[in-house]
């Protein structure tokens, strides 16, 4: 999760919502890809950290199925990202801070408990959540101060 937090800090420094992700091969715990939100730079609402990382991982291993991989995310995934995690069949999801507005794992939609979900990863929440929450709070304070 520390590496995902480093990615979130990179996003913060680029004025992107500070969400970071790493995907790890379960058998040796090696990070195969890391990413962060890139929505503003790419001018593309689909460029969430999870989507970028899943796309890169699938390309790297030449497979749409990531059964032997885990994903670490600094913020609870939204509905789009939760669906991508399910469709790519990631084994385990570890995330930091909950997202009371857009979170779709445990906060709101609970995508993985819905009938629309065909693969449910093992879910572990609250991993270094205080660091993720602090970074999000700092980011939105910074954004509000530039608007004023």
From Swiss-Prot:
Zn(2+) binds at residues 48, 78, 81. Its EC number is 3.5.4.33. Binds 1 zinc ion per subunit. It is an enzyme of class 3 (hydrolase). It catalyses: adenosine(34) in tRNA + H2O + H(+) = inosine(34) in tRNA + NH4(+). The active site is at 50 (proton donor). One of its GO terms (biological process) is tRNA wobble adenosine to inosine editing. Keywords: Hydrolase, Metal-binding, tRNA processing, Zinc. Residues 1-116 form the CMP/dCMP-type deaminase domain. It comes from the Bacteria. Homodimer. This is tRNA-specific adenosine deaminase. It comes from Rickettsia typhi (strain ATCC VR-144 / Wilmington).
């Amino acid at each position: 999760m520390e590496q995902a937090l480093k990615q979130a800090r990179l996003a913060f420094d680029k004025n992107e919502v500070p969400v970071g992700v790493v995907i790890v091969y379960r058998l040796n715990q090696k990070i195969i890809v890391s990413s962060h939100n890139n929505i503003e730079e790419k001018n593309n609402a689909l460029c969430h950290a999870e989507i970028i990382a899943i796309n890169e991982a699938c390309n790297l291993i030449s497979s749409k199925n990531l059964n032997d991989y885990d994903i670490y995310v600094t913020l609870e995934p939204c509905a789009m990202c939760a669906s991508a995690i399910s469709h790519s069949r990631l084994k385990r999801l570890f995330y930091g801070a909950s997202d009371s507005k857009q979170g779709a794992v445990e906060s709101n939609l609970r995508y993985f408990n819905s009938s629309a979900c065909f693969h449910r990863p093992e879910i572990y929440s609250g991993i270094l959540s205080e660091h993720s929450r602090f970074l999000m709070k700092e980011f939105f304070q910074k954004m509000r101060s530039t608007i004023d």
